[in-house]
Protein backbone atom coordinates (compact mmCIF):
# COMPACT_ATOMS: atom_id res chain seq x y z
CA UNK A 1 0.00 0.00 0.00
CA UNK A 2 2.80 2.40 0.90
CA UNK A 3 4.60 1.70 -2.37
CA UNK A 4 1.39 2.22 -4.36
CA UNK A 5 0.76 5.50 -2.56
CA UNK A 6 4.29 6.69 -3.30
CA UNK A 7 3.97 5.73 -6.96
CA UNK A 8 0.72 7.69 -7.18
CA UNK A 9 2.42 10.73 -5.64
CA UNK A 10 5.33 10.44 -8.06
CA UNK A 11 2.95 10.12 -11.01
CA UNK A 12 1.02 13.18 -9.85
CA UNK A 13 4.24 15.14 -9.44
CA UNK A 14 5.16 14.29 -13.03
CA UNK A 15 2.06 16.14 -14.22
CA UNK A 16 2.96 19.37 -12.44
CA UNK A 17 4.02 22.23 -14.70
CA UNK A 18 7.47 23.75 -14.28
CA UNK A 19 8.56 27.34 -14.70
CA UNK A 20 11.49 29.08 -16.34
CA UNK A 21 13.22 29.59 -13.00
CA UNK A 22 13.43 25.85 -12.39
CA UNK A 23 14.76 25.31 -15.92
CA UNK A 24 17.46 27.94 -15.34
CA UNK A 25 18.41 26.41 -11.97
CA UNK A 26 18.63 22.90 -13.44
CA UNK A 27 20.74 24.17 -16.30
CA UNK A 28 23.17 26.06 -14.05
CA UNK A 29 23.74 23.14 -11.65
CA UNK A 30 24.26 20.65 -14.47
CA UNK A 31 26.54 22.93 -16.46
CA UNK A 32 28.77 23.65 -13.46
CA UNK A 33 28.95 19.94 -12.58
CA UNK A 34 29.88 18.98 -16.14
CA UNK A 35 32.53 21.71 -16.41
CA UNK A 36 34.06 20.70 -13.06
CA UNK A 37 34.08 17.05 -14.05
CA UNK A 38 35.60 17.60 -17.49
CA UNK A 39 38.24 19.97 -16.11
CA UNK A 40 39.19 17.53 -13.37
CA UNK A 41 39.56 14.62 -15.77
CA UNK A 42 41.48 16.67 -18.34
CA UNK A 43 43.90 18.05 -15.74
CA UNK A 44 44.76 14.55 -14.53
CA UNK A 45 44.76 12.86 -17.95
CA UNK A 46 46.94 9.72 -18.11
CA UNK A 47 46.13 8.39 -21.55
CA UNK A 48 44.40 5.01 -21.63
CA UNK A 49 45.15 4.53 -17.93
CA UNK A 50 42.60 7.27 -17.28
CA UNK A 51 39.87 4.77 -18.09
CA UNK A 52 41.06 2.26 -15.50
CA UNK A 53 40.00 4.44 -12.57
CA UNK A 54 36.46 4.37 -11.21
CA UNK A 55 36.71 8.08 -10.46
CA UNK A 56 37.04 8.91 -14.14
CA UNK A 57 34.53 6.32 -15.36
CA UNK A 58 31.90 7.49 -12.87
CA UNK A 59 32.58 11.11 -13.81
CA UNK A 60 32.22 10.29 -17.50
CA UNK A 61 28.90 8.54 -16.92
CA UNK A 62 27.49 11.26 -14.68
CA UNK A 63 28.44 13.77 -17.39
CA UNK A 64 26.43 11.69 -19.86
CA UNK A 65 23.49 11.59 -17.44
CA UNK A 66 23.60 15.31 -16.67
CA UNK A 67 24.17 16.35 -20.28
CA UNK A 68 21.36 14.07 -21.45
CA UNK A 69 18.99 15.52 -18.86
CA UNK A 70 20.04 19.02 -19.88
CA UNK A 71 19.31 18.32 -23.54
CA UNK A 72 15.97 16.63 -22.81
CA UNK A 73 14.82 19.41 -20.49
CA UNK A 74 15.95 22.09 -22.95
CA UNK A 75 14.02 20.35 -25.72
CA UNK A 76 10.86 20.25 -23.57
CA UNK A 77 11.31 23.86 -22.46
CA UNK A 78 11.89 25.21 -25.97
CA UNK A 79 9.02 23.17 -27.39
CA UNK A 80 6.66 24.58 -24.77
CA UNK A 81 7.78 28.13 -25.50
CA UNK A 82 7.43 27.58 -29.22
CA UNK A 83 3.91 26.19 -28.90
CA UNK A 84 2.87 29.06 -26.66
CA UNK A 85 4.40 31.65 -28.97
CA UNK A 86 2.68 30.18 -32.01
CA UNK A 87 -0.67 29.97 -30.26
CA UNK A 88 -3.33 32.15 -31.82
CA UNK A 89 -4.09 33.81 -28.49
CA UNK A 90 -0.56 34.05 -27.06
CA UNK A 91 0.02 37.67 -28.03
CA UNK A 92 -3.21 38.93 -26.48
CA UNK A 93 -4.12 37.00 -23.34
CA UNK A 94 -2.31 37.18 -20.04
CA UNK A 95 -2.78 33.44 -19.57
CA UNK A 96 -0.84 32.90 -22.77
CA UNK A 97 1.95 35.13 -21.58
CA UNK A 98 2.13 33.05 -18.42
CA UNK A 99 2.18 29.85 -20.48
CA UNK A 100 5.44 31.00 -22.04
CA UNK A 101 7.01 30.22 -18.68
CA UNK A 102 5.37 26.78 -18.26
CA UNK A 103 6.82 23.47 -19.42
CA UNK A 104 6.67 19.80 -18.44
CA UNK A 105 9.39 17.29 -17.66
CA UNK A 106 8.99 14.64 -20.37
CA UNK A 107 11.92 12.36 -19.54
CA UNK A 108 11.09 8.65 -19.43
CA UNK A 109 11.30 6.63 -16.24
CA UNK A 110 13.97 4.45 -17.86
CA UNK A 111 16.13 7.57 -18.15
CA UNK A 112 15.57 8.32 -14.49
CA UNK A 113 16.65 4.77 -13.57
CA UNK A 114 19.87 5.27 -15.55
CA UNK A 115 20.49 8.66 -13.93
CA UNK A 116 19.87 7.24 -10.46
CA UNK A 117 22.42 4.48 -11.11
CA UNK A 118 24.99 7.02 -12.25
CA UNK A 119 24.24 9.25 -9.25
CA UNK A 120 24.94 6.34 -6.90
CA UNK A 121 28.16 5.63 -8.83
CA UNK A 122 29.41 9.20 -8.42
CA UNK A 123 28.33 9.10 -4.76
CA UNK A 124 30.58 6.04 -4.40
CA UNK A 125 33.45 8.12 -5.76
CA UNK A 126 32.72 10.93 -3.32
CA UNK A 127 32.33 8.65 -0.28
CA UNK A 128 35.32 6.38 -0.79
CA UNK A 129 37.70 9.24 -1.55
CA UNK A 130 36.48 11.20 1.46
CA UNK A 131 36.68 8.27 3.88
CA UNK A 132 39.60 6.18 2.65
CA UNK A 133 41.74 7.71 -0.09
CA UNK A 134 42.13 11.33 1.02
CA UNK A 135 43.02 10.40 4.64
CA UNK A 136 45.77 8.01 3.46
CA UNK A 137 47.14 10.28 0.73
CA UNK A 138 50.80 11.26 1.13
CA UNK A 139 49.84 14.92 0.57
CA UNK A 140 47.48 14.87 3.53
CA UNK A 141 43.68 15.17 3.56
CA UNK A 142 43.45 18.74 2.24
CA UNK A 143 46.38 18.30 -0.12
CA UNK A 144 44.70 15.28 -1.68
CA UNK A 145 41.82 17.48 -2.81
CA UNK A 146 43.84 20.55 -3.76
CA UNK A 147 46.51 18.79 -5.80
CA UNK A 148 47.01 19.26 -9.53
CA UNK A 149 45.16 22.54 -9.83
CA UNK A 150 42.26 21.36 -7.67
CA UNK A 151 41.38 18.74 -10.29
CA UNK A 152 40.89 16.19 -7.52
CA UNK A 153 38.47 18.52 -5.76
CA UNK A 154 36.47 18.80 -8.98
CA UNK A 155 36.04 15.08 -9.67
CA UNK A 156 35.83 13.89 -6.06
CA UNK A 157 33.69 16.62 -4.49
CA UNK A 158 32.26 19.39 -6.67
CA UNK A 159 30.84 17.27 -9.50
CA UNK A 160 29.56 14.49 -7.18
CA UNK A 161 27.85 16.88 -4.76
CA UNK A 162 26.17 18.84 -7.55
CA UNK A 163 25.01 15.60 -9.19
CA UNK A 164 23.49 14.45 -5.89
CA UNK A 165 21.77 17.81 -5.39
CA UNK A 166 20.45 17.67 -8.95
CA UNK A 167 18.96 14.22 -8.38
CA UNK A 168 17.27 15.09 -5.10
CA UNK A 169 15.91 18.46 -6.24
CA UNK A 170 14.85 17.70 -9.79
CA UNK A 171 14.36 13.95 -10.24
CA UNK A 172 11.35 13.62 -7.94
CA UNK A 173 9.29 12.55 -10.98
CA UNK A 174 11.25 9.30 -11.00
CA UNK A 175 8.81 6.45 -10.17
CA UNK A 176 11.19 4.43 -8.03
CA UNK A 177 11.06 1.02 -6.38
CA UNK A 178 13.40 -0.69 -3.96
CA UNK A 179 14.71 -2.82 -6.86
CA UNK A 180 16.32 0.26 -8.37
CA UNK A 181 18.59 0.52 -5.33
CA UNK A 182 20.05 -2.90 -6.09
CA UNK A 183 20.42 -2.03 -9.79
CA UNK A 184 22.56 0.91 -8.68
CA UNK A 185 25.12 -1.41 -7.06
CA UNK A 186 25.87 -3.00 -10.44
CA UNK A 187 28.31 -0.35 -11.82
CA UNK A 188 30.64 -0.32 -8.76
CA UNK A 189 30.71 -4.12 -8.50
CA UNK A 190 31.20 -4.49 -12.26
CA UNK A 191 34.14 -2.11 -11.96
CA UNK A 192 35.79 -4.37 -9.37
CA UNK A 193 35.62 -7.25 -11.84
CA UNK A 194 36.92 -4.99 -14.62
CA UNK A 195 39.92 -3.84 -12.56
CA UNK A 196 40.73 -7.40 -11.46
CA UNK A 197 40.67 -8.60 -15.08
CA UNK A 198 42.98 -5.77 -16.14
CA UNK A 199 45.39 -6.79 -13.42
CA UNK A 200 45.24 -10.56 -13.96
CA UNK A 201 44.97 -10.80 -17.74
CA UNK A 202 46.55 -7.57 -19.01
CA UNK A 203 49.20 -7.19 -16.31
CA UNK A 204 48.17 -3.62 -15.52
CA UNK A 205 49.68 -2.11 -12.37
CA UNK A 206 48.80 1.16 -10.70
CA UNK A 207 50.71 3.92 -8.96
CA UNK A 208 54.30 4.26 -7.86
CA UNK A 209 53.93 1.11 -5.77
CA UNK A 210 52.77 -0.94 -8.78
CA UNK A 211 49.61 -2.05 -6.98
CA UNK A 212 47.42 -4.77 -8.43
CA UNK A 213 44.39 -2.48 -8.11
CA UNK A 214 43.81 1.23 -8.70
CA UNK A 215 42.84 1.90 -5.06
CA UNK A 216 44.20 0.76 -1.72
CA UNK A 217 40.87 -0.69 -0.60
CA UNK A 218 40.83 -2.94 -3.71
CA UNK A 219 44.49 -3.94 -3.56
CA UNK A 220 44.18 -7.70 -3.24
CA UNK A 221 47.93 -7.96 -3.87
CA UNK A 222 48.59 -6.57 -0.37
CA UNK A 223 49.25 -8.96 2.56
CA UNK A 224 45.55 -9.00 3.56
CA UNK A 225 44.60 -10.27 0.09
CA UNK A 226 40.94 -11.07 -0.50
CA UNK A 227 40.05 -12.69 2.83
CA UNK A 228 42.82 -11.87 5.30
CA UNK A 229 43.55 -9.31 7.99
CA UNK A 230 46.83 -7.41 8.31
CA UNK A 231 46.02 -4.17 10.17
CA UNK A 232 49.70 -3.52 10.83
CA UNK A 233 50.18 -2.95 7.07
CA UNK A 234 47.67 -0.06 6.92
CA UNK A 235 49.09 2.62 4.61
CA UNK A 236 48.55 4.27 1.23
CA UNK A 237 48.56 0.86 -0.52
CA UNK A 238 46.22 -1.14 1.72
CA UNK A 239 43.66 -0.78 4.48
CA UNK A 240 44.90 -4.02 6.03
CA UNK A 241 41.55 -5.77 5.58
CA UNK A 242 40.63 -8.39 2.99
CA UNK A 243 39.09 -6.88 -0.13
CA UNK A 244 36.11 -9.27 -0.02
CA UNK A 245 35.09 -8.05 3.43
CA UNK A 246 35.43 -4.43 2.38
CA UNK A 247 33.25 -5.05 -0.68
CA UNK A 248 30.48 -6.46 1.51
CA UNK A 249 30.65 -3.45 3.83
CA UNK A 250 30.79 -0.99 0.93
CA UNK A 251 27.84 -2.63 -0.82
CA UNK A 252 25.71 -2.39 2.32
CA UNK A 253 26.70 1.26 2.70
CA UNK A 254 25.78 2.02 -0.92
CA UNK A 255 22.41 0.31 -0.52
CA UNK A 256 21.83 2.51 2.52
CA UNK A 257 22.89 5.60 0.58
CA UNK A 258 20.51 4.65 -2.23
CA UNK A 259 17.64 4.34 0.24
CA UNK A 260 18.45 7.75 1.68
CA UNK A 261 18.56 9.34 -1.78
CA UNK A 262 15.19 7.85 -2.73
CA UNK A 263 13.68 8.89 0.61
CA UNK A 264 14.85 12.47 0.05
CA UNK A 265 13.59 12.38 -3.52
CA UNK A 266 10.18 11.10 -2.36
CA UNK A 267 10.01 13.81 0.30
CA UNK A 268 10.69 16.35 -2.43
CA UNK A 269 7.85 14.85 -4.51
CA UNK A 270 5.45 15.21 -1.58
CA UNK A 271 6.54 18.81 -1.07
CA UNK A 272 5.88 19.59 -4.74
CA UNK A 273 2.39 18.12 -4.50
CA UNK A 274 1.59 20.15 -1.39
CA UNK A 275 2.56 23.33 -3.20
Give the residues covered by each predicted segment.
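Membrane-interfacial, low-structure loops and terminal tails that flank and connect transmembrane helices
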Residues: 2-22, 76-110, 265-275
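Alpha-helical transmembrane segments
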Residues: 25-40, 119
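Hydrophobic alpha-helical membrane-insertion segments
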Residues: 121-122, 182-203
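Membrane-interface loop-to-helix entry segments
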Residues: 149-161
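Interfacial segments of alpha-helical transmembrane regions
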Residues: 98-121, 177-186
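Membrane-interface transmembrane-helix boundary segments in multi-pass integral membrane proteins
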Residues: 202, 207-262
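Juxtamembrane "helix-exit" motif on the non-cytosolic side of transmembrane helices
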Residues: 42-48, 131-143, 200
Amino acid sequence: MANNSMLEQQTAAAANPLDAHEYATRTAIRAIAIIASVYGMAASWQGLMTFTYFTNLSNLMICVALAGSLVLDTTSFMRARSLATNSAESAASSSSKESLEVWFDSKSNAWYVFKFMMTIAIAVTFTLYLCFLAPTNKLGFVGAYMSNGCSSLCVHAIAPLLAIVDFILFDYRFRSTSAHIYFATIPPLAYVAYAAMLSEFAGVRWGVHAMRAPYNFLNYGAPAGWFGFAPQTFNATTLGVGVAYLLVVFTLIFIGVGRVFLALKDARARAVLQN
